[in-house]
């Protein structure tokens, strides 16, 4: 398994990295502002209203996160009962409730060159693999080796990995099993 300490340490690094990226404007060209209408509830009165809001940054970063604060959080509870063993997953090392979307433009290299578009990467293929429902989030452990084998690649051939940092336990487990440093 993945220890609580490792999960909390990873979560701290993730929060710090996101905070630094936001502070330094690293994501400004990656996030397109989106204006929507949002229901807002006044906590004191319960009054609901619809207000316009523009989302222009990831709102889920907690830049003031500390390791001491993470270690002080209690394991997640569900209906008053600990989930499974309930020892390690907390609000600090697990995903928050959030909405999001993404898009990716894929085109032929010749078309990109003709249009003076500099590719950010190469799409080599994809693979899918299943796992048990209670093993949510560890699909890469099964799919990545298939994909690498199909293309004659090794983990060390990949410059940048995205394993979804929603849950520290999940990303650390996947990285450990796949041998991603």
Residue ranges of each PLM-predicted region?
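Flexible glycine-/small-residue-enriched beta->alpha junction loops
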Residues: 1
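Active-site pocket-shaping loop/turn-to-helix segments
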Residues: 5-11, 86-102, 124-150, 159-165
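N-terminal extracellular/periplasmic Venus flytrap/periplasmic-binding protein-like
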Residues: 9-114, 179-181
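Short helix-loop-beta-strand segments that form the rim/entrance of peptidase-like active sites
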Residues: 118-124
